[in-house]
Structures are given as C-alpha cells and as structure tokens.
A protein has these predicted regions:
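Positively charged n-region of N-terminal signal peptides that target proteins for export
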Residues: 1-5
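Hydrophobic h-region of N-terminal signal peptides that target proteins for export
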Residues: 6-18
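Signal peptide processing junction and immediate N-terminal pro/mature segment
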Residues: 16-26
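Active-site beta->alpha N-cap acidic-glycine motif
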Residues: 24-145, 230-231, 248, 264
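C-terminal domain-boundary segment and adjacent tail
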Residues: 65-68, 81, 170, 221-224, ...
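Catalytic domains of cell-wall/extracellular-matrix polysaccharide-remodeling enzymes
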Residues: 79-85, 106-255, 261
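Glycine-rich, charge-decorated loop segments at or immediately adjacent to ligand/cofactor-binding or catalytic sites
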Residues: 88, 179-180, 268-272
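Short alpha-helix boundary/capping motifs
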Residues: 92-93, 120, 188-190, 273-278, ...
Length: 315
C-alpha cells in the first residue's frame, strides 16, 4: 500500500514537472510563428454582381466568425450616411469588430491641395459619427496610407492625433487587393457566370506574397516576429476569397490574431521620420534605415504592378 502511494506521488510530481516545459515549448513555438490580424478599409454600400450588399457583407463577417478573428473596419463614413451605410457599420459593430477612423471623405493627405486644417476637420467629422458605436476604436488610418508630403504637415497632424487621443492604425502588410477586386467586379458584370477561380488563386498568391515580403523585412528590422496588420478593403474579393486566404495563411504556419491584440505590439510605437510619410509601417522603417533601397519601390503597392500579370492570365 505504501509503495503504491509512493509511486502515485512520483507520477504526480513527474507530471507536474512536465507542465512548465510544455508551456515553455508552446510559448517558444508561438514566438517563432508569424502572426497576422485582418483590417479592412473604407466601407461600401454597393450591391455587387450576383450579390446584394447584405449578402456579400455577411460573407465577410461569416468568414471572420468561422476563423474566430476579430478585425477593425477603418470606415470613412461620408458615403455611409444613409440606411445602407448605417447597416454596414452596425453589422460590423454587432459582430464584435472595431470601428475606427479613416476620415470622412477619403482625401489624399499628400496632395498639396489638402491642407493640414482640412485634414483635421476630416478626422473630427468622422469621429462625430463613429464614436457612437459601442466598439469605437480610437485609431486613425490615413487614406491611401499617405501621411503627408511636407515635414510641417506630417508633424502637425501627428501632434493633432496625440492631442485627440488617437493612435496611428498602421498597416504592416500592404497590398493591392482593391485592384484585384475592381477587375473581379468588372468580369462578373460582363458575365455573371464567369469562372472566378483564377481571380481567387491570384488574390491569395498576391496577398501572401506581400505578407512574406513584409514579414521578411520586419524580421531583419526588429530581430523578431512582430504582430502584423494586413490591409484589405470592404469589397467583393474579400467576401468571396477571405475564407480561402485565411486558410492559406494557417496552412503556411501563420497564426491569426485579433486586430486589437496586434496593435499592442511595440513596433506600432515606432514613428518613422521619412518624408513623404506613409506606406506600410515596415516599408517606412526600412526606408528610414537606408539599407533597403534596392528592395523598396514607390509607391510601395499599386495596381499598376499587377496589371501586366493579370492581363497575361486573362483576369
């Protein structure tokens, strides 16, 4: 009897001793896996070929729900000041996603015609609408990721963000999903029965290619695996292909995390000094370092970079 109790005691001690090792191994694995959160820009009220607004919007939300991923919608509410727009905002809010600021009318801050005072008004006007939502998130994303073409505008608006309690809703993984979506809609408008598998494959290939590129830069710049935020738009491509895209990231070993968790990463405290300012945060940090001139292009991402390949593929 005493021997049995002793053996049981040893077994318990052995199992207890193994638990920290297992947790440590899990922690080490997590620290070496790339992580990504999904963020969406704009907000559309359009019906799309084959899908009503309610249908394709719900497809995005359903796929986020399927993968247990909480996103941020950076909304510019100027075009959303109607019943359909209110539906979009409330549907995302009720699904537990954050609603953040993307200006009211989506102006380009790097345009000399867009003054600092005009841009401040854009933030405030948008803020007055989105602040009423329970999941309001005090982050601001620059339209087109353009943060100003002069030092005065860049520093002036950064000071304004801080004054108003906002943080910069940086993208770390930039891409041109909007361009693929525009061609997808064009094809389905021409032929609602068109085979879109080629668009799906190209979308996944493009988004993942940009993720690998920016993750590699981030590794070199920080010496670790950061929490990424990837740029998508509220569009038909996301509705049709998001499930496959997330599955692809998972298959490649990426961990999907919530957007508000991603924004807690210390990398988002970095303030690049390059002017013109903007693009992906990782692009800006690489540009600032002066070590990656052969790897960087300007603009960092653009539909023009995809046109020839999509043309050749008949997309």
């Amino acid at each position: 009897m005493a021997k049995s109790i002793y053996l049981l005691f040893l077994l318990i001690i052995q199992n207890l001793g193994g638990m920290p090792d297992n947790k440590l191994a899990e922690k080490e694995l997590s620290s070496t896996r790339p992580k990504v959160a999904f963020t969406f820009d704009d907000g559309s009220t359009r019906d799309m070929p084959n899908y009503s607004l309610e249908e394709w919007n719900e497809m995005i939300l359903s796929n986020l729900r399927k993968h247990d991923a909480k996103a941020v919608l950076f909304a510019n509410v100027g075009p959303l000041q109607n019943e359909k727009g209110k539906y979009v905002l409330s549907s995302w809010d009720k699904a537990g996603h954050k609603i953040a600021n993307h200006t009211y009318t989506h102006p380009r801050f790097s345009d000399p015609k867009t003054t600092l005072e005009m841009f401040k008004t854009e933030l405030l006007r948008n803020d007055s609408v989105i602040r009423s939502y329970p999941n309001f998130y005090q982050y601001f994303r620059f339209p087109y990721l353009k943060e100003g073409e002069t030092k005065e505008k860049v520093e002036g608006f950064r000071a304004f963000l801080k004054e108003k309690g906002y943080k910069n809703g940086h993208v770390t993984i930039d891409a041109s999903d909007w361009y693929i979506a525009s061609r997808l809609v064009e094809r389905l408008t021409e032929n609602p029965q068109a085979d879109v598998s080629g668009f799906r494959d190209f979308y996944i290939e493009h988004m993942y290619d940009r993720a690998v590129f920016y993750d590699g830069l981030a590794d070199e710049l920080t010496g670790r695996k950061i929490h990424h935020t990837i740029l998508l738009h509220h569009n038909l491509a996301a509705a049709m292909f998001l499930d496959d895209l997330i599955a692809h990231f998972k298959e490649k070993g990426w961990e999907i995390i919530d957007a508000d968790e991603a924004f807690k990463d210390p990398v988002f405290n970095e303030v690049p000094t390059v002017v013109p300012a903007g693009e992906s945060l990782i692009w800006a940090l690489a540009k600032q370092s002066g070590k990656y001139e052969k790897d960087l292009r300007y603009p960092a991402e653009n539909g023009d970079y995809l046109k020839a390949k999509m043309d050749s593929l008949g997309l």
